[in-house]
Swiss-Prot record:
Region of interest (Disordered), ranges: 1-42, 282-381
Gene name in the database record: ermE
Database matches in SMART domains: rADc (SM00650)
Domain of life: Bacteria
Keywords: Antibiotic resistance, Methyltransferase, RNA-binding, S-adenosyl-L-methionine, Transferase
Keyword Transferase: yes
Gene Ontology cellular component list: cytosol
Residue ranges, compositional bias (Basic and acidic residues): 1-19, 301-358
The name this protein goes by in its record: rRNA adenine N-6-methyltransferase
Binding-site positions, S-adenosyl-L-methionine: 42, 44, 69, 90, 115, 131
PANTHER family: DIMETHYLADENOSINE TRANSFERASE (PTHR11727), DIMETHYLADENOSINE TRANSFERASE-RELATED (PTHR11727:SF7)
Reactions mediated catalytically: adenosine(2085) in 23S rRNA + 2 S-adenosyl-L-methionine = N(6)-dimethyladenosine(2085) in 23S rRNA + 2 S-adenosyl-L-homocysteine + 2 H(+)
Function field: This protein produces a dimethylation of the adenine residue at position 2085 in 23S rRNA, resulting in reduced affinity between ribosomes and macrolide-lincosamide-streptogramin B antibiotics.
EC top class, as a word: transferase
Length: 381
């Protein structure tokens, strides 16, 4: 695992993170009712589903686990039977006290009465598991993606959230595409709302994030990939081709779309993550921005680049021979018009040069910290 200083984007400070309802006054007849409303407490009671969550996490005896929102402790016990150490963060003081009493017979369980979003990830590899409150799902996903030593994150979320993030609708979110070189996103299965108490208004799902053993992109290449994805998800242009043409030459864009099997009129949300990587493979020319100069000595658009810089003087001298001054002026005027067209051709030629050389494909490496490329905090994206 890579160290935290390899992360291009620093983690937010602990004091910047907290449960959104922590300090909000909530009405209720009893403290229990108020806490359930304030902290979004819907407890999963189905033991079969609980066992399925623990199984999906694929825990190892040597791997510590962090859990958010243990509730009544049913999942916590299941995790403790499979992991070396389980640290459960419960923000509700009443529940935290009850859990410590219930789980006192499990020496490898630690109950922490604190907001999970303020926790620091352990320095060693670990797994995250939790049936998390719907209201802080995005914040917890962000926390997991930014944790430099996390291996997997298995969580119960709203069904809609899980489907949007894992492409279950055939659409992909910006967050998923941005982090795909570092993490796999997997929709595991639906969880019926009737398995919770109190029964929520919507169904849930088990979703898993798994850090790739070898990143598909890393370092500067990852940053350029994120920049490309960000460009397309801005909503400017109306389709993926129009968005890409804001930065990349037309011929290279057309070749990249063909290489990835993506139609020019495609909406970005319908482009699969692996297609984004194939697009990047063809588009990535870090040393040749749009409108840049081609390499010396390369012929561009049928004209030598040096000829364009001279404005056609040498050609004019050779072509006019013994013509009088008026003929040379007329010939020069014609050459200037032609030179203007050739400059346009030259830009096309630069695109052709960029397509022919310097292609960079997805590369493996040792980096696992990775910049997840998220913008913003809580709130579904």
């Amino acid at each position: 695992m890579s160290s935290s200083d390899e992360q291009p984007r620093p983690r937010r400070r602990n004091q910047d993170r907290q449960h959104p309802n922590q300090n909000r006054p909530v009405l209720g007849r009893t403290e229990r009712d108020r806490n359930r409303r304030q902290f979004g407490q819907n407890f999963l009671r189905d033991r079969k589903t609980i066992a399925r969550i623990a199984e999906t996490a694929e825990l190892r005896p040597d791997l510590p686990v962090l859990e958010a929102g243990p509730g009544e402790g049913l999942l916590t016990r299941e995790l403790a039977d499979r992991a070396r150490q389980v640290t459960s963060y419960e923000i509700d003081p009443r529940l935290a006290k009850s859990l410590r009493e219930k789980l006192s017979g499990h020496p490898n369980i630690e109950v922490v009465n604190a907001d999970f979003l303020t926790a620091e990830p352990p320095p060693e590899p670990f797994a995250f598991v939790g049936a998390i409150p719907y209201g802080i799902t995005s914040a917890i996903v962000d926390w997991c993606l930014e944790a430099p030593t996390i291996e997997t994150a298995t969580m119960v979320t709203q069904l809609e959230f899980a489907r949007k993030r894992t492409g279950d609708y055939g659409r992909w979110s910006r967050l998923t595409v941005m982090t795909w070189p570092l993490f796999e996103w997997e929709f595991v299965e639906k969880v019926d709302r009737r398995l919770f108490k109190p029964v929520p208004k919507v169904d849930s799902a088990i979703m898993r994030l798994r850090r790739r053993a070898e990143p598909l992109l890393e370092g500067a290449a990852l940053e350029r990939y994120e920049s490309m994805v960000e460009l397309c998800f801005t909503g400017v242009g109306g389709n993926i081709q129009a968005s890409l043409l804001r930065k990349y030459p037309r011929r290279r864009v057309e070749a990249a779309l063909d290489h990835a099997g993506v139609g020019g009129g495609a909406v970005v949300a319908y482009v699969r993550p692996e297609q984004w990587l194939r697009l990047f493979e063809r588009l990535d020319q870090k040393n040749e921005p749009r409108g840049g100069q081609p390499q010396r000595g390369r012929r561009t658009g049928g004209r030598d680049h040096g000829d364009r810089r001279t404005g056609g003087q040498d050609r004019g001298d050779r072509r006019t021979g013994g013509r009088d001054h008026r003929d040379r002026q007329a010939s020069g005027h014609g050459d200037r018009r032609s030179s203007g067209r050739n400059r346009d051709d030259g830009r096309t030629g630069e695109r052709e040069q960029g397509d022919q050389g310097g292609r960079r494909g997805p590369s493996g490496g040792g980096r696992t910290g990775g910049r997840p490329g998220r913008r913003g905090g809580p709130g579904q994206r």
